[in-house]
Amino acid sequence: MAKKALNKLIKLLDLEHLEENLFRGQSENIGGPRVFGGQVIGQALTAAVRTVPSKRFVHSLHAYFLRPGDMEYPIIYDVERTRDGGSFTTRRVVAIQKGEPIFDMALSFHKKEKGPSHQIDMIDIPGPEECISELEVKKKMIDKVPLKYRDFFLRERPIEIRNLPGEGMFEEPKKKPPHKHVWMKAVGKIPDDVVQHQAILAYASDMGLLSTSMNPHRLSFAKGNVMSASLDHAMWFHRPFRADEWMLYSTDSPSASNARGFNRGSVCLLYTSPSPRD
């Protein structure tokens, strides 16, 4: 069943080509009328890639969510070919539903080049094998969920998530520092394609990010004492990676004010498998 959920996500991110620079995507049911923001980011990235010269891969993207997406309607992705330079390519993608833009994203792509390289070390925390899966946490609290929602609550998801003890989204809300660490990976093998791994990480990057800024305020989705939505989202891709191997997603929230929370995250990799081919 878990592999079925991943195959469904891969299909969801594989857009229908309508005509030059125009693509159409469908939406998944996440338990409400709105479209999941990570889905739109991943689909918009896929649309942009379809217009980019080969051997150039996204290194940064900056997006704004303009309106809530409606799960019942397809999404049209309109790609603007802003610039094709000697080393860099720039694209803009507008996602449209019912004649109105719901999302706007700028992306920059870069060909492989040699240069200086460094990175920070991974922090010393318990590994994924020492953490309990989010699904197991849900099973322990299923008695608190209304009967009609239980099957959906326990549904298989394409991304496996393991929280450090006391840091899960479904923990009893209590005042905590505005940071957390999550192990995540796709539940099955992803084809050796850089773009698919990037699109799936883009999808996963919007999972649980918002709740980081709620930690100091005893707010929790599990308690239903807060409503939230993403306003914008940015990502930087520094190196090739595999989204089907364990990744540590460390998030923190430097500030929350005026009914807005600022959340940021970094991804460190824990694997020895070869990265996807260029």
Q: Language-model features: where?
A:
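Short tryptophan-centered beta-strand motifs in secreted/extracellular beta-sheet-rich domains
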Residues: 77, 249
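Low-complexity, intrinsically disordered Gly/Pro/Thr-rich segments
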Residues: 261-267
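Local beta-strand/beta-hairpin segments that build beta-sheet-rich folds
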Residues: 94, 101-102, 273
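Conserved small/polar residues in nucleotide/adenosyl-binding loops
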Residues: 271-278
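Hydrophobic, proline/glycine-rich low-complexity stretches
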Residues: 1-74, 82-86, 91, 113-115, ...
